[in-house]
Amino acid sequence: MMSMLGGLQRYFRVILLLLLALTLLLLAGFLHSDLELDTPLFGGQAEGPPVTNIMFLKTHKTASSTVLNILYRFAETHNLSVALPAGSRVHLGYPWLFLARYVEGVGSQQRFNIMCNHLRFNLPQVQKVMPNDTFYFSILRNPVFQLESSFIYYKTYAPAFRGAPSLDAFLASPRTFYNDSRHLRNVYAKNNMWFDFGFDPNAQCEEGYVRARIAEVERRFRLVLIAEHLDESLVLLRRRLRWALDDVVAFRLNSRSARSVARLSPETRERARSWCALDWRLYEHFNRTLWAQLRAELGPRRLRGEVERLRARRRELASLCLQDGGALKNHTQIRDPRLRPYQSGKADILGYNLRPGLDNQTLGVCQRLVMPELQYMARLYALQFPEKPLKNIPFLGA
């Protein structure tokens, strides 16, 4: 009888051990399945201090103002120096090739942490301003929609656009309106992103030349964001820079109302790709590169989780900061003149109203999130160079 009881006890112990092992296996599988979502962003890579020496090539009409706001905020909250335009300038010498003397306060030993204002890339001169360990990145947009945006925004500035009644008309016969000899005023009218990288926008789209220039960009720029996939791009940027989530959360800035966006026919889109063939090759290449990097470093499941975290935090901040659920406002509806964006050409540039009654600390956070780039540049200039006259933003007095 005793031996039978002993046998039963051993039997139940074995069963309990098997159940315990099965439970542990199931738990391990559950934890592994959630690892992509719950692991901190920097899991699987060497951790370290946040990157603070950064050069962002701010291309035109590519969501770059939103990225600029991210960098300005990081610089201000971390007490970093910014390479700001000298004197009364609002850009770093654009459309001429960048020279170090376009930066306020530059000297033989002076180096800055962050450079992100509009310039035409010129590496030897940039290296006179930025440290050797600088992280270089930029952003591109589908050239069809980048050109459409430029046509509206620079309609009254670029000679090629002034004479064209519509983008359809311009692209139907671009040489009627575009003159190579006036390209410094017409930089927005053909291969503008290619131009911003320091290349010739009127060069022939020959395979060897294009590949050599793209390789040149790849050697210098460690990341190229894509405007159509901005949230995914910001997730990867955050990973590369080792920043906190709030550092890369941003609201859309310098965006247009829907009524000022032209609908383009398939024929017009194809003409735009052909006219801006160099931009198209650049965009195609780095769009593929971005997704290859995302797959390699994050994987689809983890990427979805990180993008949702970013969007959820943006919604939280919008609820905290913005009136009317964060609806974009026409500039005439923005109560605080310091938050009104600059209006250009035929574009209707939108902005935000902040919720009333915010405490001072929250108000400061929210103001930085929605501050247009010219006002923010003037703010940083005053903080960085208190002994110099304030930057003048003329349209604020209008």
From Swiss-Prot:
Residue ranges crossing the lipid bilayer per the database entry: 11-31
Signal peptide stretch: none
Single Gene Ontology BP annotation: glycolipid biosynthetic process
Activity regulation (UniProt): Strongly inhibited by Cu(2+) and Zn(2+).
Lineage: superkingdom: Eukaryota
Lumenal-side positions: 32-398
Cellular component, GO, one term: Golgi cisterna membrane
Enzyme Commission number, as recorded: 2.8.2.-
Tissue note: Ubiquitous. Detected in heart, stomach, colon, liver and spleen, in epithelial cells lining the lower to middle layer of the crypts in colonic mucosa, hepatocytes surrounding the central vein of the liver, extravillous cytotrophoblasts in the basal plate of the septum of the placenta, renal tubules of the kidney, and neuronal cells of the cerebral cortex.
One Pfam family matching this protein: Gal-3-0_sulfotr
Activity versus pH, per record: Optimum pH is 6.0-6.5.
Function statement: Transfers a sulfate group to the hydroxyl group at C3 of non-reducing beta-galactosyl residues. Acts both on type 1 (Gal-beta-1,3-GlcNAc) and type 2 (Gal-beta-1,4-GlcNAc) chains with similar efficiency.
Family: Belongs to the galactose-3-O-sulfotransferase family.
Name assigned to this protein: Galactose-3-O-sulfotransferase 2
Taxonomic classification: Eukaryota, Metazoa, Chordata, Craniata, Vertebrata
Originating gene: GAL3ST2
